[in-house]
Amino acid sequence: MFKIMPQHFLGGLVLLTSVWLTGCASLPSDVQRPVSTALADNSGTRLGAAVSARAAAATTRNDSAFALVGSAELAFTSRMTLIKAAEKTLDLQYYAIHADDTTERMFEALREAAARGVRVRILLDDFNTAGKDAQVLQLAFEKNIEMRLFNPLPSSRASGLWRIVSSLSDAARLQRRMHNKIFVADNAVAITGGRNLGDTYFGQSEGVNFVDIDVLAAGRIARDLSRSFDGYWNNPLAYPVQSLISARDIEALKPKPVAAASTSPEKSAPLAPEPTRAQADANTPNKTTVTRVAVNPAGLTTTIAALPDTTDLRLLSWTWAASTMLVDKPSKIADDADAAEESNNTTVDGLLSLMARAKTDLLVVSPYFVPGPEMMKQFADLRKSGVRVRVLTNSLASNDAVAAHAGYVRYREGLIAMGVEMYEMRSEQRGTVSSFGSGAGLGAGSGGGSSGASRASLHAKAVVVDNRLLVVGSMNLDLRSKLQNSEVAIAIRNRKLASEATALIEPGLTTGAYRVELVNGQLIWRAPAGSGLPDATSEPDASLGLKLLVKVISPFAPDEML
């Protein structure tokens, strides 16, 4: 039994009282939400006209085109390119937008777009809008920029931890989050996938950088994503920022500057001017680019100042293909009967249905992997049918959500026993920070130990079925994505794209991950061939404290909460 020492009693009482008072707080009831929708006719925009021209020239009846985005740099520059190219509308829907260097460059580009008359709508889940990241909300007070927060918490934004503690009285609201990730320009070209917005998603964090996958989408599928955005934007759970917080209150939350002992030259360098845009070359062959860059002294893939602002999207390998959007309705997050009725009609359910069609090979990438009994049965059925199943997920050391790993370990031995090939991503990628890229892998180190200048964490969510069907989206294979969060994904039926995705992912299995095997009842982590690393009999690169924490959490944490 815990005891409260006398000297801490008053502080504890104040804390509990504050939490209770915050729990009694409520959201505004009289909120004005002007209805708005995506651009109805984009034929008068350069992006719309370009997509139409490409569609007319394509020798296919498919109405959507796609290009995979594996590298962190391309993920940044493609978004910047769309911002700068937009003439009418920009719609952004994200779970998290961090206030840092890469997003400040995006914000400046968004302000410039708004100044030239582009309508900018930003829909952001409210969970991560505390502390430093609350400064993102300042965009809501710019002309031509509208920002709404989805499923907001009526609690302080002083810090993320305090938001969680002070929202425990409404745990159901706290758990249900909008996890969708959509970026659409002029209702013509879109980006969706696993990435949120921030340094850690664009290879610019001095700590951990996420390895992720997005897909650029043009044509009809972009319009589908826009319709999904509109459904969330005009939903009663979307609150205009101005109805929740004032510009003055946001300014008051700004972190006080701290004098640094030393300043990295990379971080202090002025932003590089926008490079001259490459001219399109009709004879340029379609190739999947290889992205592998050396780490600088700060541990970054490239200096922020050196990141280009744009890329020529015309030079990417675009493929016209049959596709469909998988998306949860906003009512999934609402606490009502409709949501309960739709609990078996989710993005994850659609994904599982597609996975069940596998005949020969299933490749799964899921950073947070807590399958639960239903998914375990599906994996067992696939293995009984002779389907090869490979799963890439995070190791304990690379996982930024220890609780999720605690849920995963309950199923790991069972998966391996049924013949699923399990790979866990290495946290330390010696000497390099790598993105998914054809032939690049996930940091194939040059021997020695697994200690290096950079740390990586898997964040990509993708599935390849029989090398003919590719699914990329925001969902994880866990019960949180199935039951708690709203998600979005694109399923693309095309052998070329599925093969490209496989070529992006497979080097990560062989060079950037441990193969986990079960030998005589003992788990063995097989180090990548040629890495110079030893095999391990316990979670590699993880501290003893972290391993003990997982053992404590694992038997008790419910799957649907992880």
Question: How would you describe each model-predicted region?
Answer:
Residues 2, 6, 21-181, 185-562:
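Charged, low-complexity intrinsically disordered terminal segments
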Residues 11-22:
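Bacterial N-terminal signal peptides
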